[in-house]
Amino acid sequence: MPRGRARFTSRCDHAGVATDKPQTISYPAPEARPHRYDDVAVDPHVIVLFGATGDLAKRKLLPGMAYLDQSELAPNIQIIGTSLEDLTDDEFRTLAKAAIDAFGTHKLTDGQWDSFAQNLTYVPQGAGPEALAAAVARAEAVLGPDVRRLHYLSVPPKAARAVITMLRDADLVDRSRVVMEKPFGTDYDSAVALNDFVHETFKERQIFRIDHFLGKEAAQNILAFRFANGLFEPIWNRNFIDHIQIDIPETLGLDERANFYESTGAYKDMVVTHLFQVMAFVVMEPPTALEPRAISEEKNKVFRSMLPVKCSDVVRGQFTGYRQLPGVARDSDTETFIALKVGIDNWRWAGVPIYLRTGKRMAEGMRIISIAFKEAPRTMFPPGSGVGAQGPDHLTFDLADASKVSLSFYGKRPGPGMKLDKLSMQFSTQEVESAGDVLEAYERLILDAMRGDHTLFTTAEGIESLWERSADLLRDPPPAKTYAQGTWGPNAIHQLIAPNAWRLPFERAWRDKK
């Protein structure tokens, strides 16, 4: 069977019978479309949190669920924690309170904590599916009729199958949605196998493959910026844009994740599951409506149009000292840094290079998308005017929590003669009256999953497309080059992007100077 067939054909018809008919998506009439209603209250939910004692649960999920409960965005929830640890309900509540106090951005009063704590129970995973089913039944009895279930799999990828099996054996599939953490497979074959396994129990519409980058307000603002304004979308194409950069350097190391990272690396951990998803928002065609099916289809079109990643367009790196970390092989070639060039072969973007970079232990922690516009003719300006001296005009999205959008362009320096300087216009979400109401990424995504909104989640087809286009790189990756901690990566990154230049660190230095 040719590669890609499993992705481009539907696996079963409505009766569950396998079919080779091409996959098609039909849209209802505009007035009948299921538009997003972000202000509609969610149904009562029982949330089963697998991996409830893990790092992600303590840092993000438990604080986020507490805020959703106490802010009344999701006021009717019961949370059942489960993990391999053998805890009582009170011990789990103690763990949850410590996590919320340490990591929550929205602090709870004593009264709020007492109210939230009543919603927390715990079932050791070793107690089996019957005990879990009984705990869910008790929680549903508290909430009353019309209760839905959200199963959050905050577990390592190798444990996902066991959790899905446990949910099936506990008969907790109906009225349920399941949230899965990255990575979704490690290559094309494993992604197809994982999707097929999950689809044996859950329908695709029940599955939410989470990417917390898309849960950030700044990432979602890309859609509003592009499609709600007539200013930039007419020039958002190969005729006016020279290249695009998506740059996510991190100062953080791996701490206790080195053993996990050794079998994963930066490409599988960050690029496939994060950077490519952000890229799709930047380059996708306008959807027919801001509703999940239409947006997912446009994202999938981007992934179908993406050219295979060539090894010659990739720089892999490894920070000095990585091989000395516990759990890392002394001859490890795992990359802690990667930079690559990709292309989208469609009418809008053919010939426009897209550069992506991410890594650990780098000089700064930043998250930017930079759009470089083609330069204007320079011959009319006198020598020494400074035109072009500071690179092309850039539109930059800062994806940090205090998100900004900035536009840099040339203007005349005050005084005699024609001397040009780079000028900047900036917009910050802090200028918006409701900036304090912004949800953190995981809070937003949990809320969307409870509403059944797939807009910010990855589809099976999308993830399989990306792994297929990564096949050559995964089969024969270039060797990882060492780079010093606290730098911007191996020197080869400059040859990769030449004759252009990386926007970082120039973007930060230039804006801070202003």
Question: How would you name each of these model-derived features?
Answer:
Residues 1-16:
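N-terminal amphipathic/basic-hydrophobic helices that include classical n-h-c signal peptides
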Residues 12-180, 184-514:
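Secretory/organelle targeting and membrane-embedding segments
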